[in-house]
C-alpha cells in the first residue's frame, strides 16, 4: 500500500513537472517562432552540430548496410568528407557519437534531422530536471542529510524539489549555452545521477545506477566525462568522510564508553580504514563503468593526445581581468551574450535568496563549504584551466554551480527552520515567485540581450542569432547548396578520378560532410595533430590549428595535397587573382542538389509563376598538377636537413623527396648494410634500401627591399654586429635581405599604421612575405602614444589578437590582400605558430611592393622579415616528376550509404624502389 502511494506521488510529481516544463519551454519557443527563427544557432550549431548529427545517422545506416551486405561487424570508420579525411568516431564523438539520444538518428531520414535536432534541444533539459528530482527526492525525501552537519528536514511535500528542478533546467547553461551548443546540457543529466549513484552505493550497497551512469557519461562525451569525473570524485570524498565519521560517532555514543579518553580517540580514528574501503569500492565501480565504454573512449583518448589544442601551452594568469568580475555579478541573475570564458550562470533570484538564507540557518556545513568553494572557483582562472583539462581557461563547468544553487533552494525550503505562515498559501506564493522569476529570466534575457559579434543587428534580441525557420526541403537545400555540391556535380559530369580534393575562396564550413567530398576545409574541435604540424612546418597562414580553410593558395602545396579543383563563390576579377598557378578555367557551375529549391523571401509558393529557384553559382578551376591519392618518390630528405631550411624552401623540397624521420633513416641504413654484407634481397629493409638521399634544388629568390614607415610606426633593424638602427620616416634605408638577415622590430603607437617594403618585381612567380619567430606585445610605455599620455608598464595589457594586414602592390595599385591574425598565449585559440610565409599570389607580372598595416598598437618583433619570390614553372617541374609512377586502379571501397571506408586499394608498377 505504501509502495503504491509513493508511486502515485511520483507520478503526480512527474505530471506536474512535465506540465510546468512545457509551459515555460513553450514561452521560450514562442520568442523564436514569433520572429520566424529556428532553434539552430547560425554559427557552430549550423556549421558543426547539425551537420555532425545528420552524418551520424547516415553513418549508422551505412554500417548496418555493411553488416547485412558484407557480413562484417567492423565499422567503416574513415570519412573522406571530414576535411582532408578523418576518423569518424574521434572527430564527431564530441558532438554526438556515443550519446544514446543522438543514436536514434539511425531511424531519422536526413531531411528531418533538423526537427530531431530541435527536439533534442528541448528534451535534454527535461531529462536533466528528472535526474535532479531523483537525487533531491532521495536526499531530502528520505532524509539522507544526517551525519553531515545539516539540520533535519520537514515533510514539505514535493514543492521544494519541483522548484529546484525548474531552477536547474532553466539556468544559464540551458537558456544560453545549451541553445548555442545543445550537447553542453548532456552533463546536466548525468551529474545528479552520478551523485545519486554514490549515495546508493554508500547507503544501500547498490551500484547499478552508478555503474550505468558512468558508462553512459563515458560514452556520451569524453570532454564532459572528465569534468563529471572530477566533480564526482570530490563529492564522493566529502560524502564518504562525512558519512563514515558520522556513523563512527553514533557507534561511539551508543557504546557509552566512559573509560579512558585514549580508547575513545582510537575509536574515533577507526573510521579512516572504512572510508578508504568505501572509496576504493567506488573507484572500482567507476573503473568498471569506464572500461565498459572503452571501445569508444580509448580511441578518443589516443586521438586527444595528438590533438593540436591539447598540445599547445596557453598562458595562465593569476586573476581574471576586472571586466570579468563585474560581468560575473550580472551573470548571476541573467545570462550574458558571449560571456567571457563561457561563464554562464543565469540563476533564479529565488536561488540566490536561498543561498543567502542558507548562511543564517544552523547546520548545513557541507553545503555552505560547497557554496564558498564554488564562489572561489568562479573567481580564479586556475579552476577553469583545470576543469578544461589544462588546455586553456574556460568555464564550461558552471552547470555544477547551477546544480548546487538549485539544490540549496530545495534544502533551504525543506528545512524545519523555514516556516511559512498559512503553510499552503505561503508555499504557493513562494512557488509562484519561482515560476515568475524563471519566466522573467527567459523574457528579459531573450528580449533584452543584443545579438553578439556573430549575430545580426540585435534588434530582435537573442533569437536574431539563429537560423530562419525552415521546412525539411528548405533545410536540405540550405545544407547542400554550396561549393561542395558544385564540385561533386562537375566531377561526376567530367569523369574525375576516384579521389580528388577541392579548395577555394569563402568555403562553406564542413560542406563536405554531406557530399563526402574531400576538401582543405576543416572545422571540428578534435583534430588530427599531423595536419597542424604540417601547417606549422610550412608556415601556412591559417587561423587555428583545429579549424582551417586552405593552403594559402600555394601552387606546390595544392599539388601535393591532391587538390583537383579551386572554387570561387564571388565571381569577379578581384577573387580571380587568388587562383594559383596551373589551374585551368572550367567555367561556372550551378550547385543543384536533390532537394527542392529554396523559396524566395517574397513568399512565393513552389510551382507558382512568381517562384524562382535560388541556385548559387560557383566558378571552378581545375589543377593540371594535382597529384593522385598515391604517388611515389625515389629519394628522401633527412628531417634534420628539412627543419634547417627556409619556409619556402621546404615546400619545394617536398616536391623532390619524401621527408623521413630519424627512425626511418636508421631503418634504411640498416637495410643497405644488410644488403651489402649478406646480399639479402628480402624483407622491408631491403625493399626500401634503394632510396637515395636527394639534394633539393631551389628556384626561390630572396629580394632586397627598402622599408618605408608611415605615421605611428618606427622600424628597428638589428645588424649582425649587434648595433640597432631605429628607422623612422617616409624613406628608410634598404635592408639587407640575404641569407643572414637581421632581426626586425616595429613599434606601433597608432592603430592602422603602415609600413611599405619595396623590391624588384618578378615575372611568373608567387610572392611571399616571410616572418620568422613573430612575437607581439604591448608598448612598454617609454614613448608617448600619438595624442595620448604615457602608459605605464602596469597599465599595458596584452591583447588576444594582433591583426597584420598585407597588401600586394604593383606600381602603386593594390592587387591582393591577406590578413594574419596573430594570436597570443592568452587567446583560447592560440596555436603556438610563430613562423609564417604569407603567399600574396601568383602573377605573370608580380608585385613590386608589400604594404603592411598593423591594426593594433604594440611591439611586433621577428627574427627575420623577408620577401621571397618563387618562380612557379621551374618549381612545378618537380611535380611532373611525381606523376611518372603513381597508384592506378584506385578503389576507395566507399559505403554506398555513408560513403565511409576502411580500406584503399590500388596498383603501383615501379621499375625501381620507391616510397609511396
Q: What do these predicted regions represent?
A:
Residues 47-48, 54-59, 63-66, 94, ...:
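Periplasmic/ER-lumenal interhelical loops and adjacent helix-loop junctions
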